[in-house]
Design a protein with these regions (language model features):
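N-acyltransferase acceptor-side catalytic subdomain
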Residues: 1-136
Length: 136
C-alpha cells in the first residue's frame, strides 16, 4: 500500500474524480462523503490544517481516504473528520470493500508514524452504525 498525507487544498481538489469513484465502491457510501460535499464543507466551514490520508494499492488505484483535518483547542491538537463540526451526518473513512483491513492498517501506520501531524485526540463524529471504523 502507498500512503500519502495531503495538506494542500490543490491536492485535495485534484482527487475529485478518483474520490467519487472510490465512494461508489466504499463500504459506507454517503452523500456527506462525496468530494463535492467534503470540499464545500472545507471551503466554507473548515479551519485548521488539512490532513487527508490517501491509500493506494500496488497498482496505484485509490482504495482508501481518511478525510481528516487538524485543529488546536486549549493547546491540544485534535484530528477530526472533515465535516465533523456542523451540518454533516454519516461521516467515516472512505474504504474500498476489497481492502478494508489493509487500508485501516495503512491509515493507522501513517497517523502513528514519524511524519504524521502531531495529535493527542481523534474526533470521529457521526459514524453510521454500519461503519467498521469503531471495531478496527
Amino acid at each position: 500500500m502507498q500512503v500519502q498525507l495531503i495538506s494542500e487544498v490543490s491536492e485535495f481538489e485534484a482527487l475529485a474524480g478518483e474520490w467519487d469513484a472510490l465512494l461508489e465502491r466504499a463500504v459506507v457510501p454517503s452523500l456527506f462523503l462525496s468530494w463535492v460535499w467534503q470540499r464545500t464543507w472545507w471551503q466554507y466551514l473548515g479551519n485548521g490544517q488539512l490532513a487527508l490520508i490517501t491509500v493506494r494499492d500496488d497498482a496505484g488505484n485509490l482504495v482508501g481516504i481518511a478525510p481528516l483535518f487538524r485543529q488546536t483547542a486549549d493547546g491540544l491538537h485534535e484530528l477530526s473528520l472533515v465535516g465533523c463540526v456542523d451540518v454533516s451526518d454519516y461521516l467515516d473513512l472512505i474504504v474500498d470493500g476489497c481492502c478494508v483491513e489493509p487500508v485501516y492498517r495503512a491509515v493507522w501506520d501513517c497517523l502513528s508514524g514519524p511524519h504524521a501531524p502531531s495529535w493527542v485526540e481523534m474526533n470521529l463524529c457521526h459514524l453510521p452504525l454500519s461503519s467498521p471504523t469503531p471495531a478496527i
